[in-house]
Amino acid sequence: MSQLLTSRQAEELHKSMIAYLNSANLLHSAATLREELDIGESFDSATSKKYEGLLEKKWTSVVRLQKKIMDLESRNAALQSEIDNATPTSLSNRNTDPTAWLPKSPARHNLQSHREAITCVAFHPVFSSLASGSEDCTIKIWDWELGELELTVKGHTRAVLDVDFGGPRGGTLLASCSSDLTIKLWDPSDQYKNIRTLPGHDHSVSAVRFIPSGAAGSPSSGNLLVSASRDKTLRIWDVSTGYCVKTVRGHADWVRDVAPSYDGRWLLSAGVDQTARIWDASSGEPKATLLGHENTIECCVFAPPASYPHLAAMAGLKKPPAASSSAEYIATGARDKSIRIWDARGTLIKTLIGHDNWIRALVFHPGGKYLLSVADDRTLRCWDLAQEGKCVKTISDAHGHFVSCMRWAPSVIKDAPLLNGENGVGTPIKNGNGATKKEDAKGSDIDCTSLMPQIPSI
């Protein structure tokens, strides 16, 4: 013992042992130990009280440290195994090419608080905040970096069907829409206070998106919002006044989804009538109608310019469109279990088959090479556009139930998180740049799959 402990440490250990024996009412043993250690009358009741409980604290600390060591050893072994199984090329790509990074299991966080199915998720454009909407009529705000609930926002009287962050520069707002026929605007800078309610739709409002600044006819940059409804219409709103500035008609049934182009010039909508439609955002006039799906189209998205080289090659073109063009290619996902890629004239380029149930959400990878999808088959799939849309990765354990939504955070590639959601009660956040939402029959989760590229790792 003298080789391991200093004289002071040895003295404290001896006194702790004696104090422990006294507290255990083993007085004879305590006296014997004092005699053997030559600890005299200086060890009085005050000294005994000082050292009482110290031995137990040291013991429990050792147990905690042993557990921590075991956990770290297990994590180290898993990381070593990953390194051993990786090729030099894959390691190089992981460390130098975030544009090729793809999500993987396990989830980083599992966020639980909703009491019914989660229907939608959205990232704050600046802060590490994540909003989730649910059939329990609430919106919950989470810190997706910490995996903690920050706030529950109440106001809707029926299921919240979609949420989106946006608004004028320097004045970010949260918009939500609901089966209660309303759209509500919330102020993140004031504890998500409800600052405006937009009535006008005649049925459930299924989707809502801020239109990026630059749209022709915008009364003020960043002030436009578009909504899609079961009343078969799209409506464009001025969030500064709350007025509906345009109603767009053309769909023959429920409009399930709407997406603006990156410059705000075009709108893409899709719905139960099995069509996707491209509209001029300033005039509301149709540009193209996409026909081919055999069931309800659940989701639609414009391809970013970074995807143009891959999609142009897939379409058989020698030269991709100019990056300044914002509505050249489109992807749609439907209840016919297929994903279809189109050009802006409505020509079908490719049909991607692989999901076993309804396609619920699509996002293009910020690097442009991949298209990611989630579906009611509980999977997240990654399609390589440079390989004719080949499915190069499937996360089969993304959720324990239907995966109902997915979003990629509006950020630079190295920071951009992805979020997808499901009918359940928890939210796993996966290592990477994004988030996913998971739900089961007992409640609602948000599976925030933070799909961050490995540079830097978090």
From Swiss-Prot:
It comes from Sclerotinia sclerotiorum (strain ATCC 18683 / 1980 / Ss-1). SUPFAM superfamilies: Lissencephaly-1 protein (Lis-1, PAF-AH alpha) N-terminal domain, WD40 repeat-like. Residues 436-445 have a biased composition (Basic and acidic residues). This is Nuclear distribution protein PAC1. Dimerization mediated by the LisH domain may be required to activate dynein. The keyword Acetylation does not apply. PROSITE patterns: LISH, WD_REPEATS_1, WD_REPEATS_2, WD_REPEATS_REGION. Belongs to the WD repeat LIS1/nudF family. One of its GO terms (cellular component) is microtubule associated complex.
